[in-house]
Structures are given as C-alpha cells and as structure tokens.
Amino acid sequence: SLHDALPIFSTFNLHWVSTLSMRLGSILAAAVSTWIVFRTGTLIHSARAGWVAALLYTCSIYTSIIAGLFIMPDSPQLLFFTWSIYWMAKWVIKPQQFNWINWIGLGCLIGLATLSKVHGLYLWAGFGGFLLFHQIRTLKQPFLYIAILVTLCFVLPILYWNLGNDFITYKFHSKRVLHSGIQLASFTQQILGEFLYQNPLVYISC
C-alpha cells in the first residue's frame, strides 16, 4: 500500500517529524487532486465548470478533511483516482491523440490507485462499461489490454503479501461486512454516512 509513502515523503524519511509534516503529504495530495478536478471539468466543458467541480470537491468533508488531512490510504488513492479520471476524459475528448504512451500511463495511474486501496480497480470496471456501451470498437485496441496488464503488475505486491499472510485483509473485511439476509440497518447507516461525509449540501446539489 502507498499509505506509508506520503508521511515518509513529507517527513523526509522521518528526519522532520511534527504534526504538520506527518499530515503534509495528505494535504499536498488533496491540493493536487483539487487541481486535477479543475482541469478535468475544464477539459470536458469550460473553466467555469472546472471551477465549480473543484469547489464541490473541496466542500466534501471526505475529500477535504478525511482524505485531505488525516493519514489514510484514501489520500494517495484520491490523487491517482482523480488523475486516472482526467486521463480517461482526455481519451473521451481527444481519442485520436491518445497514443500507446497514454494507455500505459493510464494503466500506471490506475495501478497506483489500486496499490493505495484495491477499490482502484473499479476504475477499469467503469471505463470498461463506458467502452462497452459507447465505444465498443476500442475493445479491439491492443494497447487497452496492455494498460490493464500494467495495472495488474501493480496488484502483484498486494497478492504476494496476502498469500503470505493467509489473505487476512479480505478475511477481516469479510467478517466485518458480510452478513446473511438483508440488513436494513447497515443499508441506512451506509446512506447516512455518505450523506454526512460528502457534506449534505454537496450531496443534495449533486
């Protein structure tokens, strides 16, 4: 996981240890993510749309405080997650300019997002769904599959560690979230959590 990389980077390998330095990596990652969201909105529509997107992103309690201030794996994940979406948007807007280097770059970005938290693989699921319904001819593009293989290379350390530790990561989360039958209380808790984490005003406006 890249969870430890940000504090190691921001503290100069623990040569500068303070409350600020420990959180600085997450703060910088959140700042860059906000800029990427602005660039994505600008690319898709206009600078004004980019500004509004960046404002909504910053107003989210999750992106600005939880992932943007606390020392969590979400901090590097959001950086590479938003960067991957920007790269995908570039392909949607200007597919003719998307060469093999761009495809490999996308594979690396999604790989880094996945190395932060395995949820990063959903980026390929979402992008694959878009291609299937809107750009099915791209599924014949060989560099698409090379990019997926690049991402899988980033997943190998996760698999290696879990193989050596009896897949404890997934066993822990399975015991925590998997229950038999419909859990109305858990469903309500999830929806309420999303509502509060994203900032009620942002949740409603979006």
Which role fits each region the language model picked out?
Residues A5-P7, F12-V32, F70:
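Loop-to-helix entry region of an early transmembrane alpha helix in multi-pass inner-membrane enzymes
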Residues L20, L24-I44, W83-W87:
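Transmembrane-helix motifs of polytopic, lipid-linked glycan transferases
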Residues L24-V32, C59, S75-W83, W124-A125:
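Membrane-embedded alpha-helical segments of multi-pass membrane proteins
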Residues I36, L56, P76-K94, G105-I110:
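Specific aromatic-rich, kink-prone transmembrane helix
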Residues A53-C59, I110, T114, G128:
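Short helix- or helix-capping micro-motifs
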Residues G68-P76:
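Short acidic/glycine- and proline-prone juxtamembrane loop motifs at membrane-interface regions
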Residues K90-G111, Q141-Y145, L149:
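Short hydrophobic alpha-helices at membrane interfaces in multi-pass membrane enzymes
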Residues L112, W124-C206:
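Transmembrane-lumen/periplasm boundary regions of multi-pass, lipid-linked membrane glycan transferases
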